[in-house]
Swiss-Prot record:
Lineage, top ranks: Bacteria, Pseudomonadati, Pseudomonadota, Betaproteobacteria, Burkholderiales
Motif annotated as Gly-cisPro motif, important for rejection of L-amino acids, chain positions: 142-143
Listed name of the protein: D-aminoacyl-tRNA deacylase
HAMAP family, alphabetized: Deacylase_Dtd
Keywords: Cytoplasm, Hydrolase, RNA-binding, tRNA-binding
Enzyme class: hydrolase
Matching SUPFAM superfamilies: DTD-like
Keyword match RNA-binding: yes
Tree of life domain: Bacteria
Family from the record: Belongs to the DTD family.
GO MF terms, alphabetically ordered: D-tyrosyl-tRNA(Tyr) deacylase activity; Gly-tRNA(Ala) deacylase activity; Ser(Gly)-tRNA(Ala) hydrolase activity; tRNA binding
Subunit text: Homodimer.
Function: An aminoacyl-tRNA editing enzyme that deacylates mischarged D-aminoacyl-tRNAs. Also deacylates mischarged glycyl-tRNA(Ala), protecting cells against glycine mischarging by AlaRS. Acts via tRNA-based rather than protein-based catalysis; rejects L-amino acids rather than detecting D-amino acids in the active site. By recycling D-aminoacyl-tRNA to D-amino acids and free tRNA molecules, this enzyme counteracts the toxicity associated with the formation of D-aminoacyl-tRNA entities in vivo and helps enforce protein L-homochirality.
This protein's encoding gene: dtd
Length: 159
């Protein structure tokens, strides 16, 4: 699975002008399932997202994770947005190819799994809508933007 993690002071996602997910300070996660991914990669990625120490302590050092935030009030939210274009292949020509992304049914299944597990592990999880045309608004804090990838084990054939 591929993700782009952004520390935000606020973020929201809209569909047809309506807010469908919104958080205060926390993390915006753009998420893409790749061919060959399974719940194993999803779970590993979620663990990394929750434990990554990218929030500042009193001394200004990145020492706190999303798990360290209570998720109440305006701090500690996780906004998860599906984005299959993270699997773009731009190696040939000028038009990106998306054959490395999971098929839509598998992508939805893994996205839903990720969100369900996130909701079990963290008190404030909001989402966009899988497959929808969305507008994402965010105020990047820092900025802190980190690409993440949990690849399937070597030898696992793409589906």
């Amino acid at each position: 699975m591929i993700a782009v993690l952004q520390r935000v002071s606020e973020a929201r996602v809209l569909i047809e002008g309506q807010i469908v997910g919104e958080i205060g300070a926390g993390l915006l996660l753009l998420l893409c399932a790749e061919r060959g991914d399974s719940e194993t990669e999803s779970d590993k990625l979620l663990s990394k997202v929750l434990k990554l120490r990218i929030f500042s302590d009193a001394a200004g050092k990145m020492n706190h994770s999303l798990q360290d935030m209570d998720g109440r009030g305006t701090a500690g939210g996780l906004l998860v947005v599906s984005q299959f274009t993270l699997a773009a292949d731009v190696s040939g020509g000028n038009r990106p190819g998306f054959t490395l992304a999971a098929a839509p049914a598998q992508g939805r299944r893994l996205y839903d799994h990720f969100v369900a597990q996130a909701r079990r592990a963290h008190p404030v999880v909001r989402t966009g809508q899988f497959g929808a045309d969305m507008q994402v608004h965010l105020v990047n804090d820092g900025p802190v933007t980190i690409p993440l990838r949990m690849a399937p084990p070597a030898g696992v054939a793409p589906e």
